[in-house]
């Protein structure tokens, strides 16, 4: 191996170790279940994005198997070559019916959706206004676009409006936000954001990754909670990999936006399409979430119970109002030690550190699901409180 490169990479890895930011892969079994297995130890799964418990649902498995038997295991090409399987049209039509939009485009992941859409729409002639706590894929898309990047303080609409006022009138404006923030569990003020985009002649993209399947009528997303709000949003992005228990993502909105992305989005054009099995499972998942109010109600109730108990116990859970509940502890070392103790006690709870979250805000990110029982959550809360007292992490 080239010794210059070896020395450079070793130095970088040593730096990550020293900063408490080195990452490992751990084999995990039964991650689709409420209780998983890691290092031969059974743990309560409070780290998964399988919010509605659909990743292990027999109906999705059967749909995936049926599509594999009928159509094979691979897409064989990109969608623009010969990989545009008949199921794509069916699922995209289902998404439009679900979201009330004109056209949809299925892509391979939420990350490729965001980097592709933003870098295709925006250029050096434009300004993108982005919430400071938006997902990394949004940030990366803005960087790739070459657009002027204006970050507004988290959920601070006064700051956003100030930036909009200061923007050059010659430049096109794009606002982008998560709807549910993945590391904090709070939500964007969508109605106010839409008012600002209309006032200043911008367009808006919303990332519904952690809201699709959960909020709004039929689980269509946070943008569907308020009447007539979703139609004022230009592009909706959502994933199939979280509440829907599958894989992949979608972009949906007016015909012209999706037509443009289909022709310009490099992360869509230059990649092999999703396999038929995934599309079959996604179609079944959409059918289920549109009708299964009980799963959504259970998830929302479990989130409220878990948040309330942790907040009452004195933990810093920020402004969480959803099924994602962080305990912010500050340093990488505290987060890693707390995570280790929790896993030893039988709770799958993962330390989240920079650059995923801002410096000095390392945390344990808990995610409850609709499948957890109150007994499960109470059992976990008792152990979380006990370990936190021993580790002296209360604020």
From Swiss-Prot:
Its EC number is 2.3.1.47. PROSITE patterns: AA_TRANSFER_CLASS_2. SUPFAM superfamilies: PLP-dependent transferases. The modification N6-(pyridoxal phosphate)lysine is found at residue 242. Substrate binds at residues 23, 135, 356. Pfam families: Aminotran_1_2. InterPro entries: Aminotrans_II_pyridoxalP_BS, Aminotransferase_I/II_large, AON_synthase_class-II, AONS_Archaea/Proteobacteria, PyrdxlP-dep_Trfase, PyrdxlP-dep_Trfase_major, PyrdxlP-dep_Trfase_small. GO terms for biological process: biotin biosynthetic process. GO terms for molecular function: 8-amino-7-oxononanoate synthase activity; pyridoxal phosphate binding. Keywords: Biotin biosynthesis, Pyridoxal phosphate, Transferase. Pyridoxal 5'-phosphate binds at residues 110-111, 182, 207-210, 239-242. It catalyses: 6-carboxyhexanoyl-[ACP] + L-alanine + H(+) = (8S)-8-amino-7-oxononanoate + holo-[ACP] + CO2. Pathway: Cofactor biosynthesis; biotin biosynthesis. It comes from the Bacteria. Its cofactor is pyridoxal 5'-phosphate. Homodimer. Catalyzes the decarboxylative condensation of pimeloyl-[acyl-carrier protein] and L-alanine to produce 8-amino-7-oxononanoate (AON), [acyl-carrier protein], and carbon dioxide. Belongs to the class-II pyridoxal-phosphate-dependent aminotransferase family. BioF subfamily. This is Putative 8-amino-7-oxononanoate synthase. It comes from Bacillus cereus (strain G9842). The gene is bioF.
